[in-house]
Regions:
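C-terminal alpha-helical "lid/dimerization" subdomain adjacent to the S-adenosyl-L-methionine
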Residues: 1-4, 117-175
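Conserved alpha-helix/loop element of class I SAM-dependent methyltransferases that forms part
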Residues: 2-22, 32, 36
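Class I SAM-dependent methyltransferase SAM/SAH-binding core
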Residues: 22-76
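Short glycine-centered segments of the SAM/dcSAM-binding site in methyltransferase folds
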Residues: 42, 113-115
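A short acidic, Gly/Pro-enriched loop at the edge of an enzyme's catalytic core
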Residues: 75-87
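A short SAM/SAH-binding and catalytic strip from SAM-dependent methyltransferases
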Residues: 86-98
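A short glycine-rich, Lys/Arg-flanked "PGG" loop and its adjoining helix->strand segment in the class I
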Residues: 100-112
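C-terminal lobe and adjacent flexible extensions of AdoMet/dcAdoMet transferase-like proteins
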Residues: 175-182
Length: 182
């Protein structure tokens, strides 16, 4: 991965170190996060793009555990209700067209008391950054990511109980830990 990926690596490693049980990893992409996964886990990973998963295949093959990669849209998960113990996301919800529905979909497949772990960049309340993020969002929204989403609000509105929020870069980049209430 590039420079930005490297600087977030320790934070991702810490977040992903909590992986246990049946794990769903959302938006695997080209697999840049795989080297930060703990060893010997069984992970189901999805991405909307078959091409991305093709590129990820060498990283999937190199992983010490097992990664079952599937082409799937978070809005249309084909898994049974209560299928997973944990769900992990990494810079995903800036690109999900309907984040609230996506999070509700994740909650459906998460067992009661299951955990959601997120590494996300979100909108800022700090004035200079808020202005910059608003401007960047005007530009990037046309191309894809909306970096200015209120992800914390979406997580709550989807019915999750947030247990922890860690601000890694002001209030723009953060980790969120939440539970699917029983």
């Amino acid at each position: 991965g590039g420079g930005a990926e490297k600087s977030w690596k320790p934070f991702k490693e810490e977040l992903f170190s909590h992986m246990s049980g049946r794990v769903l990893f959302l938006a695997l992409g080209t697999g840049l996060d795989i080297p930060t996964f703990p060893k010997n886990k069984e992970i189901t990973a999805i991405d909307i793009s078959p091409k991305m998963l093709e590129v990820a295949q060498s990283r999937i093959n190199a992983y010490s555990g097992s990664i079952k990669a599937e082409v799937m849209d978070v809005h249309e998960l084909t898994y049974e209700d209560n299928s997973f113990d944990q769900v992990f996301t990494s810079c995903t919800f800036c690109s999900v067209p309907n984040p609230l529905n996506g999070l509700r979909s994740l909650r459906r497949v998460l067992k009661p008391d299951g955990q959601l772990f997120m590494f996300e960049h979100t909108g800022s309340r700090y004035y200079p950054f808020k202005i910059m993020m608003d401007l960047m969002t005007q530009i990037t929204r046309k191309m894809g990511p909306d970096m200015n989403r209120n992800t914390v609000k979406h997580v709550k509105d989807a019915g999750f109980e947030i247990s922890e929020i860690n601000h890694l870069f002001l209030d723009v980049v953060k980790t969120i830990k939440a539970t699917n209430p029983a």
